[in-house]
Curated annotation (Swiss-Prot):
It comes from Bacillus licheniformis (strain ATCC 14580 / DSM 13 / JCM 2505 / CCUG 7422 / NBRC 12200 / NCIMB 9375 / NCTC 10341 / NRRL NRS-1264 / Gibson 46). It is found in: Cytoplasm. GO terms for cellular component: cytosol. The lineage of its organism: Bacteria, Bacillati, Bacillota, Bacilli, Bacillales. Its cofactor is FAD. GO terms for molecular function: flavin adenine dinucleotide binding. SMART domains: GIDA_assoc_3. NAD(+) binds at residues 273-287. This is tRNA uridine 5-carboxymethylaminomethyl modification enzyme MnmG. InterPro entries: FAD/NAD-bd_sf, GIDA_C_N, MnmG, MnmG-rel, MnmG-rel_CS, MnmG_C, MnmG_C_subdom, MnmG_C_subdom_sf.
Length: 628
């Protein structure tokens, strides 16, 4: 028998990286929020790599912070090393990556949730949703407890019908031998949701004491203090190194000789794996001309000897994994503490979602994270904060928030999922963003703090500091634009010493900065400000001046996109009534139900000719009501 256990505005199911952001975003907006998780000891657990950030993903972490989320602050408090990647490249592809102390990361995040007003944490297994009048009105747990709410966010990760596969051994399990969620998956199918089967994997963990580090290359963190959060003022200085080694021809031979025992090649694994994070057996087969592959040895924390063998994800049998490890320089006598494994799980087809991450089938039900077909902690957290914002706002009777592709990588991620869907675990890449020069690591606050403030996730104090930073950037740009640097003997000598050509005449400081050999520091040596300019302000000034032409071009493209985004498609449109649209396009439009002409144009199978016909139809105002 069921019993009524509580009434909330929002219930979040799952407390992984999507769940914690969803719960915090909801609660911080003033919605009474419950987060239910199978195991309270596994809040924000990292079942795979102990790291946060990297290309595109690191920018998402900063976007989460600019909106008022927690991931950036948490990793700033708990990392063991941090590096800025792609420093030799342009600002569009730079990104932070941090190695986490995974246990401290969990502990700190759980503490944050426990101390958040409006937020209740409970351990429990959700098996069914409460559906009333076609809308989601809460959840029912394994013990019969009914938690009623106005909205529900599912962030179930890889737990839905999870199955661990290791060699010829397979069993029902969530990640890291956690209890899987079987009945909720079956219930979603009963409700009419289309599910797909995906797979991900993890490498073995080895004992640090048994590694011969003299045969590996040290990979230290940056000496310059780094942080993901715009609010971080205290930096961790005692960083731990990672280590680089490589597979050998012997490693590849062992893998080749045991492919018949690999669940990936025996047909035992049915789920589709992530393209951009292949297993070692996949790498050896697909790139058989490569004599070796990189292996990074990453400590899992400060108070453990477990080391994560990055680059060796595998589901080969345990005995093969042991042999394989012993052929890698530095790991000849290594002790394997945990074997690598693959995990299969259910995900929903994400074209069943609106851009708010609410399901089209059941109003009031939102989904975020790996349940939507993505891979990665950062992608999960980015969806989590948006699902939490929108579930909270719906519960409080407020307007939805949708980030566009030109606002944020989070906008690109969600738009790709709900518009194009995915037939493999989706990973965010810089190449997926058309406006990547606008979506930089350095300007996430300038893009999104205003939105975070408007929805109540950014404090008044932080917002004032943000406004001061914006004003300082504009003031310094204006100052440099007004300064003329004259071709004096000293100035000419200085410019020549930097490898630049002499000035023919006086030049604006802003124009001088656009020269490849010049930067903010070198230009302000010739035209110093009255007071020292903060480092983050100087960085913005330099990027905005140096890349002004490219940024301007991107902004013009965004304006064109906005015109298309503003051409809304009424929900009551009947695509069957539009003559001339191709059959495939009609089917896709009916499935995705795009909100705007711009979104319609991004659906695969919808061609420019179909968009032209749709535009004419909309402009003529011939919107037929859907047949009752």
């Amino acid at each position: 028998m069921g019993y009524e256990a509580g009434q909330y505005d929002v219930v979040v199911v799952g407390a992984g990286h999507a769940g914690v952001e969803a719960a915090l975003a909801s609660a911080r907006q003033g919605a009474k929020t419950l987060v239910l998780t199978i195991n309270l000891d596994m809040v924000a657990f990292m079942p795979c790599n102990p790291s946060v950030g990297g290309p595109a993903k690191g920018i998402v972490v900063r976007e989460i912070d600019a909106l008022g989320g927690e991931m950036a602050k948490n990793i700033d408090k708990t990392h063991i090393q941090m590096r800025l990647l792609n420093t030799g490249k342009g600002p569009a592809v730079r990104a932070l990556r941090a190695q986490a102390d995974k246990f401290q990361y969990q502990h700190e995040m759980k503490k944050t949730l426990e101390n958040e007003p409006n937020l209740t944490m409970l351990q429990g297994m959700v098996e069914r949703l409460l559906i009333e009048d076609g809308e989601c009105r809460g959840v029912i747990t394994q013990t019969g407890a009914e938690y009623r709410s106005k909205t529900v966010v599912l962030t179930t990760g890889t737990f839905l019908r999870g199955k661990i596969i290791l060699g010829d051994l397979s069993y029902s399990s969530g990640p890291n031998n956690q209890q899987p969620s079987i009945k909720l998956s079956e219930h979603l199918e009963e409700l009419g949701f289309d599910l797909v089967r995906f797979k991900t994997g993890t490498p073995p963990r080895v004992n640090s004491h048994s590694i011969d580090y003299s045969k590996t290359e040290i990979q230290p963190g940056d000496e310059v203090p780094r942080a993901f959060s715009y609010e971080t003022v205290e930096y961790i200085t005692d960083q731990l190194p990672c280590w680089l080694t490589y597979t050998s021809p012997e490693t590849h031979e062992i893998i080749d000789n045991n492919l018949h025992r690999s669940p990936m090649y025996s047909g035992m694994i049915k789920g589709t794996g992530p393209r951009y994070c292949p297993s070692i057996e996949d790498k050896v087969v697909r790139f058989n001309d490569k004599p070796r592959h990189q292996i990074f040895l990453e400590p899992e924390g400060r108070n453990t000897q477990e080391v994560y063998v990055q680059g060796l994800s595998t589901s080969l049998p345990e005995d093969v994994q042991r042999k394989m490890l012993s052929t890698i320089p530095g790991l000849e006598n290594v002790q394997m503490m945990r074997a690598g494994y693959a995990i299969e799980y259910d995900a929903i087809v994400p074209t069943q979602l609106w851009p708010t991450l609410e399901t089209k089938k059941i109003p009031g039900l939102f989904t975020a994270g790996q349940i939507n077909g993505t891979s990665g902690y950062e992608e999960a957290a980015g969806q989590g904060i948006m699902a939490g914002i929108n579930a909270g706002r719906k519960a409080l009777g407020k307007e939805e928030v949708i980030l566009s592709r030109s606002d944020a990588y989070i906008g690109v991620l969600i738009d790709d999922l709900v518009t194009k869907g995915t037939n493999e675990p989706y990973r965010l890449l810089t190449s997926r963003a058309e406006y990547r020069l606008l979506l930089r690591h350095d300007n996430a606050d300038l893009r999104l703090t205003e939105i975070g403030y408007q929805i109540g996730l950014i404090s008044e104090e932080r917002y004032q500091k943000f406004q001061e930073k914006k004003a300082a950037i504009e003031a310094e740009k204006k100052r440099l634009h007004s300064v003329i640097i004259k071709p004096t003997k000293e100035n000419q000598e200085y410019i020549r010493s930097l490898g630049g050509s002499e000035l023919k005449d006086g030049i604006r400081a802003t124009d001088l900065m656009k020269r490849p050999e010049m930067n903010y520091e070198t230009v302000t040596a010739l035209a110093p400000p009255e007071q020292k300019v903060a480092g983050d302000v100087a960085e913005q000034v330099e990027i905005q001046i140096k890349y002004e032409g490219y940024i301007e071009k991107s902004l013009q493209q965004v304006e064109k996109l906005k015109k298309m985004e503003n051409k809304k498609i009424p929900d009551r449109i009947d695509y069957d009534a539009i003559k001339g649209i191709a059959t495939e396009a009609r089917q896709k439009l009916k499935e995705v139900r795009p909100l705007s002409v711009a979104q319609a144009s991004r659906i695969s199978g919808v061609n420019p000719a179909d968009i032209s016909i749709l535009l004419v139809y909309l402009e003529q105002g011939r919107i037929a009501k859907v047949a009752e």
